[in-house]
């Protein structure tokens, strides 16, 4: 487990799940709720009105926290650490029944009978009914406020596009279409991708980003003409795409997994049916200032509308049903 608390908010070691915990906890606290996060933080500490509690200490002392509501982050076993009648599990995967058993979720699930919280339409449809028998609710995430508040460039030149998701999220699909159908038609444009990845001889104009803190990502998105991201069956929300949206970067995708939920086709980006369409739409955004400006303006209209404060309020509605 990652050792973190809210002081690590912009650290490169954190992924979307961890930053979501930080933002959700702090915004629940801002709504005047006593909020505790039990995780692998190094020590017990109160930060921004949130109590961070070391999970190893709780397990060692065999104590249980008394609370009104408990929300387990993907692992129903952590519900053993609390005393409450209202229990939820925030699902971060499709989790087929076989994996559910293998991960040791069946026994605590049957003991605690939690409602499952999923992240969107794709997740809701594909989450097994068998392991959602005590109820299933949908809660859409959002991004950190820094992506909403950053001052944008008035115009982004056509010199850079970006893929800022994990390499195992179908980066190979993107590189195939980039090398075969895109890069030779825009030789002055570089594609930024995330590590780990070893460049090959066939790769053209590809730059592997250095992962430091999220402020570097902020700058890379600010200077990117478009985000090229195929999507993946394991993508349930895709924070990378949402970060691009909040930075008003148009997206080209195949719509795999939840990606069709992040893009309004031909309004804030393009959903391609095949490689030829993916290449065409990418080149349209790179080369046609009119298309790029139209989509950029559409993104600006919705920028900053869904904050973590709103997400926290939506969560409270789910809890109070």
What role is predicted for each listed range?
Residues 98-102, 112-136, 148:
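A short, active-site helix/loop in glycosyltransferases that binds the activated sugar's phosphate group
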Residues 122-123, 138-151, 197-199:
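Short beta-strand->alpha-helix junction loop in the catalytic core
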Residues 154-207:
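Conserved catalytic-core segment of nucleotide-activated headgroup transferases in glycan assembly
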Residues 172, 218, 241-246, 260-261:
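Short alpha-helical segment that forms part of, or immediately flanks, the ligand-binding pocket
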Residues 222-236, 249:
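Acidic donor-binding loop of glycosyltransferase active sites
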Residues 250-253, 263:
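Short hydrophobic beta-strand element within catalytic cores of glycosyltransferases
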Residues 265-276, 284-289:
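Conserved acidic donor-binding segment of nucleotide-sugar-dependent glycosyltransferases
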Residues 273, 290-319:
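A charged, aromatic-enriched C-terminal amphipathic alpha-helix characteristic of glycosyltransferases
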């Amino acid at each position: 487990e990652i050792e973190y608390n809210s002081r690590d908010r912009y650290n490169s070691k954190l992924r979307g799940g961890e930053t979501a915990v930080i933002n959700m906890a702090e915004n629940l606290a801002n709504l005047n709720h006593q909020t505790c996060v039990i995780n692998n933080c190094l020590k017990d500490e109160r930060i921004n009105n949130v109590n961070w509690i070391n999970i190893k200490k709780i397990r060692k002392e065999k104590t249980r926290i008394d609370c009104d509501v408990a929300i387990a982050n993907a692992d129903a076993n952590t519900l053993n650490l609390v005393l409450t009648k209202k229990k939820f599990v925030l699902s971060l995967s499709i989790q087929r029944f076989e994996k559910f058993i293998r991960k040791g979720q069946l026994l605590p699930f049957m003991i605690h009978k939690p409602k499952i919280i999923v992240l969107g339409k794709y997740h809701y449809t594909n989450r097994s009914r068998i392991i959602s028998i005590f109820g299933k609710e949908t809660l859409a995430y959002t991004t950190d406020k820094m992506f909403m508040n950053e001052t944008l460039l008035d115009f982004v030149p056509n010199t850079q596009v970006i893929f800022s998701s994990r390499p195992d999220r179908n980066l190979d699909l993107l590189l195939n279409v980039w090398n075969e159908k895109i890069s030779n038609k825009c030789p002055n444009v570089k594609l930024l991708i995330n590590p780990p990845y070893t460049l090959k001889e066939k790769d053209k104009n590809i730059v592997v980003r250095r992962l430091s803190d999220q402020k570097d990502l902020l700058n890379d998105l600010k200077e990117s003409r478009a985000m090229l991201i195929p999507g993946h069956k394991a993508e349930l929300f895709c924070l990378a795409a949402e970060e691009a949206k909040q930075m008003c970067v148009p997206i080209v995708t195949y719509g795999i997994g939840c990606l069709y939920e992040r893009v309004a086709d031909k309004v804030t980006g393009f959903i391609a049916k095949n490689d030829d369409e993916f290449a065409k739409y990418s080149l349209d955004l790179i080369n046609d200032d009119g298309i790029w400006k139209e989509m950029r303006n559409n993104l600006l209209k919705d920028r900053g509308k869904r904050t973590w404060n709103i997400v926290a309020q939506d969560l409270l509605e789910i809890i109070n049903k």
